[in-house]
Structure formats: C-alpha cells, structure tokens
Curated annotation (Swiss-Prot):
Residues the entry annotates as binding Zn(2+): H564, H568, C666, H670
EC number of this enzyme: 6.1.1.7
CDD domains according to UniProt: AlaRS_core
Function: Catalyzes the attachment of alanine to tRNA(Ala) in a two-step reaction: alanine is first activated by ATP to form Ala-AMP and then transferred to the acceptor end of tRNA(Ala). Also edits incorrectly charged Ser-tRNA(Ala) and Gly-tRNA(Ala) via its editing domain.
Catalytic activity, reaction form: tRNA(Ala) + L-alanine + ATP = L-alanyl-tRNA(Ala) + AMP + diphosphate
Protein name per its UniProtKB record: Alanine--tRNA ligase
UniProt entry tagged with the keyword Ligase: yes
Family recorded in the similarity comment: Belongs to the class-II aminoacyl-tRNA synthetase family.
Database matches in PANTHER family: ALANINE--TRNA LIGASE, CYTOPLASMIC, ALANYL-TRNA SYNTHETASE
Source species of the chain: Cronobacter sakazakii (strain ATCC BAA-894)
Comment text on domains: Consists of three domains; the N-terminal catalytic domain, the editing domain and the C-terminal C-Ala domain. The editing domain removes incorrectly charged amino acids, while the C-Ala domain, along with tRNA(Ala), serves as a bridge to cooperatively bring together the editing and aminoacylation centers thus stimulating deacylation of misacylated tRNAs.
Subunit structure: Homotetramer.
Cellular location(s): Cytoplasm
Lineage, uppermost ranks: Bacteria, Pseudomonadati, Pseudomonadota, Gammaproteobacteria, Enterobacterales
Length: 875
C-alpha cells in the first residue's frame, strides 16, 4: 500500500532527523524581515541570513517541510495552475540544509539512501536519472563512482540561458549573493509517457520529472559578476512534496494524489459539479490552499503588494466556481475540508479557521458586487463601440478597477461577436507591473546593505547607560574609520543599552558621549548580530576604537515600556472578550502610545471596547509582577506562550508573563509591574482591511491627558448649551432631532422649487426632427437637484435630450438626460463628455443619464451653446 502525503512528509523529516538534522517548523508565508521576497517561495528562505553569514543557529544541520507560494513576481505559476500536472500557487517544499557542515558527498548519499532505501521510499534505482553542472566534476564522480549510476543516466548541463552561470544547474539567490552548482534528480515514469531526458529536445514532456534539487553553495556572487568562494560551503535542497507523492502513489499528475483528490471532491460538493475531471476543480482545490494559508499568516486581500496577489487568486477561484455553476458564496466553505486534509501540518490554520472563513466570505461577497458593476460598465463600453474589437485599455481598466478578469471580458464580448485587443491589455498590464516594480520595496541588493562582522551585546534589559567601545562606523552604507561633526552615520558598539527596533517596539533614542564629541542617536536598528545607532555627530570627531558613554533617553524609554506592557495586557483581554481567534497582525509601540492590529471579522461594539478597557485596568490595579524567563522555543510554546506576528525567534526565547493573565514570547522592554502603567485608555477602534481591526491606545500620563482633554470638551459643551453634565445628553438629543426636522422641511422646499423650475423650463424646449432639446444654465440650484429636474423634464417632454448646468463655488456641475427612444442616436455619456471637455472637466454615465463636472465656469455659456449643433448632427 502506497504512503499517504502526510506519511511521506513525516518520513522525510524522520529520515533527516536520524542523520542529526534539527527539525525546524515551517516559517510564515510572509518572509520575516526580508525585503527581497514577496512570499516565501523556497525552503531556504528562512535560513537566508544564515547562508549570508548574518545569523547564527545552534545547529549546523536542519530539515523542514516548508509551505511556499509562487503566484507573483519572478516565480509566477498562476496562469498555469489547474491546466498542467504540476503547477501550483501553494506547495510544500521538503528540504535538508547544511550550514558549513557536510557538503557534496554526504548530500548526495543522503538523497540516494532516502529515495532508494527499502525502509524509506524504495524507488527503483534504474528509474532515477541525475543532472550536474557542466564543470562540476566532483558531483559527477560521486554519482558515478560512489553511488553507481551508469554514465548514460548522468547528464551534464551547461550555461543554457545565454550568460555565464545562467544554467538550470547553477542556482543563485539573486543578482548578487550566495550561489553555486546544483545536481537534480529525475524520475522516469516509463516509455508509455511522451518525453525525453533532461537536456534533450523532448525534456518538456511528462516522462522524466524532476523530484529533487540539491544546491551546493560554494560562491558569493559580487555586483561585478565575480565569484568569491564562500569560507564555509553549504547545502540547500528542495523536493516538492506533491511531486514525490505523485511518484510514490503511482500517478502521473499531482492533482491525482490523495490530498488533492479529497479537496477536489470537496470542491465538487460545494459547487454542485459532477464531472470530477473538470480543470476548474483543480484550480479551486489549489487556490484554497494558498488563500487560506496566506490569510492565516496575516495577508489580507487588498489592491497592493501581497494583498493584491491574494485578491487575484481568490477572484480566479471564484470565477472558476461560477463556471462550474456555483450560484452562491462557496469558496470559504472549503477551509474546513482543507483543515481536515492537512492534519498536523495545518494546526495553525485550524486555530484561525473562523477568521480565514470570514475573510474569504467577505471578499467573495464584495467580488459579487464588483462583478455587477463591471458588467454594467462593460455593457456601456460595448454600446459605444463602432468596430468589432474592444480596446486593451478598456479591458485593463475593467480588470484593474473592478477586478474583472480579462477572460470574462472576452466571454461577454464573444457572445456579441466582438474581439478583445489582448495585446493592448498585456501592454497596459506590463506598464502597471513596471510601475509596481519601481515603487515596490521588494528586490533589495544584499551586498548594498550594511554588513557588520561581529556582534553587539545588548544590555538594555538591566541598564539605560553604560561605557562601551566603537567597533564600526558607517556613512552612506560604507565602512569608515572616523566621523566628523555634522555627518549622518551608523555607530556600532561592542555592547549597548539601546534597544533596536523589533517586535513592533521602536528603537531607542539618546546620546553617545566621549572625548570631545557628542553623537545624537535618533534611531536604533539591527544589522545581523550587530546593533546600529543611527544619528548625527553633533560635535567633535568620533573614531573606531574610541570609548563612549552610551545613554538612552530615560523618560522616552519609560513611556515605551508602559505602552509595550499594556499591549500585552490588551492582547490577552481581546482574546477573553472577543474569542481565541484574535491574533496579532501587527503593532507599533512608541513613546506616544500603542497601535495594535488584530484578526476579527467585525467592528467592535462599544460595550466590547469598554470590557477590554476595564479588563486591562483591572490587571493594572492588581499590580501583577512582570517576569521574564529564557527557555527553549518549543518549551515556551508548550507553556502556551503566544508568538507575535512577523517576529523571528531564536531557539532560546524570552517568555514574558504578567501574573496568570498573559504569557507571550517577547524580546522587548517592559515595566516591572502592571501597576506601573497607571491608566489605560482606548482612543479608537477601526478597520484596516477585511478581517483586520486596529486599536490605538494610550497609557500613564498620556491616558491622563486624554481624560483631561475629554473633560475640558465636555465642560465647554455644557457651557455652550447652558446645561450641566447630567442633562447634557437630553439637550443635545433634542437639538439633533430639531435639526433633522428643519433639514427635512428645507429639502421639501427645494424639491418644490425644482418642480416649479422644471415646469417653467419645459416651455423653452426646441424641436429638432421630432426630438425636444432643452439646454439651460440654472442659478441657485443645488447640483444634486439637477438629476431630479432632468427626470421630471423627460416625463414632461417625451422624446427628448436635456442638458442642465449650474455653478456652485466656482465649480461647474452638468447633467445630461436622453429619453430611451433616442439613445440609439444620442448618448448622454458622449454628450456630457463633449461639454465637460470645454469646461475643464470630465464625466460619464449611462446612455440615458450622465453627469460631469468642470473647473472653468467662464467657459460654460459657450459650451452649452455648442450642444444644439452637436445634437442636430446626431439626429
């Protein structure tokens, strides 16, 4: 009996654990502190700083089953997903890693033992082929002489991509950084399937499938292209779980493995589909994996960066559901089946299931409304079309503004025998991609970052000032030996009391003083294992090797401590009041207050906000001790400590406890007891995205200042209304009700005035070939009344074209109305657009009703004067 996908995953981890590898949990799909990546797309991403020498672990061998997404940027598989046997937006990458430990010999031997060993995967040896980089004789000889693979099944692959080291068998992290040759292992499905071995003209067939890539990191590529040998060569490997599962389960497509078959049946169940071979089922089964895990890792649908990619995947899945016949929301219903099928690998998803379902449902409902608006706009554009092709710019505008997929636009057009300019659409899309690349923070060059050898010892938990030595200076990213007065610089010390920004807490400010110099620290940041003090030399000369007195801004630090401790109390209170689905999605803790983003699917009710505030203040009054303990990460999680979103933890972590109320992993600076916080007040609660809420709050003196300000406003209001605080509410309520009544009466008067104006205007209409034309500028009429007047006049005049305009505060407002029987000749949108162009504005709308605005009021009479000849030409 073949192994299940879950058993294959576990067997891989067990094998490498038996070879002395540390089993490391999958990292977030949102890369931690890595500006070069949109999503985690490979197993090595979480070890990138280790390979770069910027981070150290207490192990030199690791193995993971890493969740990955490839659906944006360089690695974009989205359009192929569902239509090929092996493309996915979400997949799991099995990997083993050596950080300066073993190299080519052991890496190859381990791979061979796992793949062919009887107690492991037990694949037939004669079905396995390998490739090596053309000049990598060492790897070739290991495969041939030690493993025993015949020469005819070992293929050398050279530079096949038009540049030196540009090869399928030479891996590089980016344009610069660690790189090296790789060896790939292929499985031969047999001659009953078309395709040739790697390197042959038929290599794109499905017979020979790559199952494992083993990268030998030997070099550090410089900006000028030169290759410098790494002091400690390393190994990075990757084997797609879905691919090896297909091989071990004796199927030719990843979508035929047990995991996908269960999901495909679940998709069919919620959409009502009966043909289980329909490719749309594959698309949706793949997309629910990427969407659910991205949301669980903190990504929310939006119109930029990661959120935009997520939105595209969700909407692609929804469209395929519609193609299958789904009439109602269905996508969110697949989260439960996904949790079941992922098992232990989906524990975090299970904890956040309700939140993920709510975000998906909200997005699905929003897209349904978007589709309706998009179809209306498309109908209008097609009604104006004179040829048989819809231009690419319009198709792109539908896609960009309404999320209207171009293939759906093409489907609608096809029903009317209209083509879509797909080349024009692609050109507009590429222009958007170019702008996104230019404005994006992704794609940083690691060699351009400050690189610091050595580390700084942080002593800020116990000290706010100490004497230290300058170990490095940087100006404009370059290492220097000294800094002079007025220069901006980064100062690195051997030890420091300054806290570097991390976990949402801002970096410390303060001063570094010494022999005739003062350096003002405006921020503190981490650079690998070093801590950089960012600021300006106020006076004197500062040199590497000098002694300094490092002094943190005490008062500012104290305010930050209170706010950070209050954040932990509030997090725990939110989980008590709203539920355990609440998870931190981001935070900012500074000396002014705190900002906390968390998962919750609706706005908090006033009574819920009050409960959270009361609960936090109750813990403050209890004056609980705030204690820290350092322990293993796994032990901390077992204790129930919550981890903070977006934070990267070492193997030994600080666990912060506030009595029996809160336990979290945190490396930040905190108060000694909860009573130090004094007072906690919530300033605001708002939404930042679907399924994400934000609370802003203040503590201590800041909270007291807020109370004073609120009391001052209350007293001022009481004085203005000649009321005391007890009767103030009743007085304001009565005033609001009276104002409402007066506004209603005023609106009625305006409508009566508009009706009278309409009656007077109808007599001024002129007849043009049986159609009444009325053009008029009205004084003293509110712009929003023009539409009502146009509707009245259309009813009075019958077949008609009406243009009304008014000027308010120097701005022109225009409304054009055309009776239905005339819209085949005169379209309101075109008419109002012609007028708007003359008054410095723009507008649009339906063929029977359109509106516009403009800024050139002086040009209005002439613009209105041009209407009669324009309409006459159409009639």
């Amino acid at each position: 009996m073949s192994k299940s996908t879950a058993e294959i995953r576990q067997a891989f981890l067990d094998f490498f654990h038996s070879k002395g590898h540390q089993v490391v949990a999958s990292s977030s799909l949102v890369p931690n502190n890595d500006p070069t990546l949109l999503f985690t797309n490979a197993g090595m991403n979480q070890f990138k700083d280790v390979f770069l020498g910027l981070d150290k672990r207490n192990y030199s061998r690791a193995t993971t089953a890493q969740r990955c997404v490839r659906a944006g940027g360089k690695h974009n598989d989205l359009e192929n997903v569902g239509y090929t046997a092996r493309h996915h937006t979400f997949f799991e990458m099995l990997g083993n890693f050596s950080f300066g430990d073993y190299f080519k010999h052991d890496a190859i031997q381990y791979a061979w033992e796992l793949l062919t060993g009887e107690q492991w995967f037990n694949l037939p040896k004669d079905r396995l082929w390998v490739t090596v980089y053309e000049t990598d004789d060492e790897a070739y000889e290991i495969w041939e002489k030690e493993v025993g693979i015949p020469r005819e099944r070992i293929i050398r692959i050279g530079d096949n991509k038009g540049a030196p080291y540009a090869s399928d068998n030479f891996w590089q992290m980016g344009d610069t950084g660690p790189c090296g040759p790789c060896t790939e292992i292929f499985y031969d499905h047999g001659d009953h399937i078309w395709g040739g071995p790697p390197g042959s003209p038929e290599e794109d067939g499905d017979r020979y499938i790559e199952i494992w890539n083993i990268v030998f990191m030997q070099f550090n590529r410089q900006a000028d292209g030169t290759m410098e040998p790494l002091p400690k060569p390393s190994v990075d490997t990757g084997m797609g779980l879905e691919r090896i599962a297909a091989v071990l389960q004796h199927v030719n497509s990843n979508y035929e493995i047990d995991l996908f078959q269960k999901l495909i049946k679940a998709v069919a169940n919620v959409t009502g589909a009966t043909d289980l071979s329909n490719k749309s089922l594959r698309v949706i089964a793949d997309h629910i994996r990427s969407c659910a895990f991205l949301i669980a890792d903190g990504v929310i649908p939006s119109n930029e960066n990661r959120g935009y990619v997520l939105r595209r995947i969700i909407r692609r899945a929804i469209r395929h559901g519609n193609m299958l016949g789904a009439k109602d929301t269905f996508f969110y219903k697949l989260v439960g089946p996904l949790v079941d099928v992922m098992g232990v690998a989906g524990e975090e998803l299970k904890r956040q299931q309700a939140q993920v379902e709510q975000v998906l449902k909200t997005e699905e409902e929003q897209f349904a409304r978007t589709l309706e608006r998009g179809l209306a706009l498309l109908d209008e554009e097609l009604s104006k079309l004179t040829g048989d092709t819809l231009d690419g710019e319009t198709a792109f505008r539908l896609y960009d503004t309404y999320g209207f997929p171009v293939d759906l636009t093409a489907d609608v057009c096809r029903e009317r025998n209209i083509k879509v300019d797909e080349a024009g659409f692609e050109a507009a899309m590429e222009e958007q991609r170019r702008r996104a690349r230019e404005s994006s923070g992704f794609g940083a060059d690691y060699n351009a970052m400050i690189r610091v050898d050595g580390a700084s010892e942080f002593k800020g938990y116990d000290h706010t000032e100490l004497t230290a030595k300058v170990t490095a200076l940087f100006v404009d990213g370059k290492s220097v030996e000294q800094v002079t007065a007025g220069q901006q610089a980064v100062v690195v010390l051997d030890e420091t009391p300054f806290y570097a920004e991390s976990g949402g807490q801002v970096g410390d400010k303060g001063e570094l003083k010494g022999n005739g110099f003062t350096f003002t620290v405006n921020d503190t940041q981490k650079y690998g294992q070093a801590i950089g003090h960012i600021g300006e030399l106020a006076s004197g000369v500062l040199k590497v090797g000098e002694g300094v007195k490092a002094e943190v801004d005490h008062a500012r630090r104290d305010r930050i401590r209170l706010n950070h401790s209050a954040t932990h109390l509030m997090h725990a209170a939110l989980r008590q009041v709203l539920g355990t689905h609440v998870a931190q999605k981001g935070s900012l803790v500074n000396d002014k207050g705190l900002r906390f983003d968390f998962s919750h699917f609706e706005a908090m009710k006033p009574e819920e906000i009050r409960k959270v505030e009361d609960l936090v203040n109750a813990q403050i009054r209890r004056n609980l001790p705030i204690e820290t303990n350092v322990m293993d990460l796994e032990a901390a999680k077992a204790k129930g400590a919550m981890a903070l979103f977006g934070e990267k933890y070492e193997d030994r972590v600080r666990v912060l406890s506030m009595g029996d109320f809160s336990t979290e992993l945190c490396g930040g600076i905190h108060a000694s007891r909860t009573g130090d916080i004094g007072l906690f007040r919530i300033v605001s609660e708002s939404g930042t995205a679907a399924g994400v809420r934000r609370i802003e709050a203040v503590t201590g003196e800041g909270a007291l200042s807020l109370v004073h300000a609120q009391n001052d406003r209350l007293n001022e209001l009481s004085h203005l209304l000649k009321s005391d605080s007890q009767t103030l509410n009743d007085k304001v309520r009565a005033m609001v009700e009276r104002t409402r009544q007066l506004e209603k009466e005023l609106q009625q008067l305006k409508e009566q005035q508009a009706a009278q104006e309409s009656a007077n205007l109808s007599s001024k209409a002129v007849d043009i070939n049986g159609v009444k034309l009325l053009v008029s500028e009205l004084a003293g009429v509110e712009p929003k009344m023009l539409r009502t007047m146009v509707d009245d006049l259309k009813n009075q005049l019958g077949s008609s074209v009406i243009v009304l305009a008014t000027v308010a505060e120097g701005k022109v407002s225009l409304i054009a109305g055309v009776s239905k029987d005339v819209t085949d000749r005169v379209k309101a949108g075109e008419l109002v657009g012609m007028i708007a162009q003359q008054v410095g504005g723009k507008g649009g709308g339906r063929p029977d009703m359109a509106q516009a605005g403009g800024s050139d009021a002086a040009a209005l009479p002439a613009a209105l004067g041009s209407v009669e000849s324009w309409v006459t030409a159409k009639l």
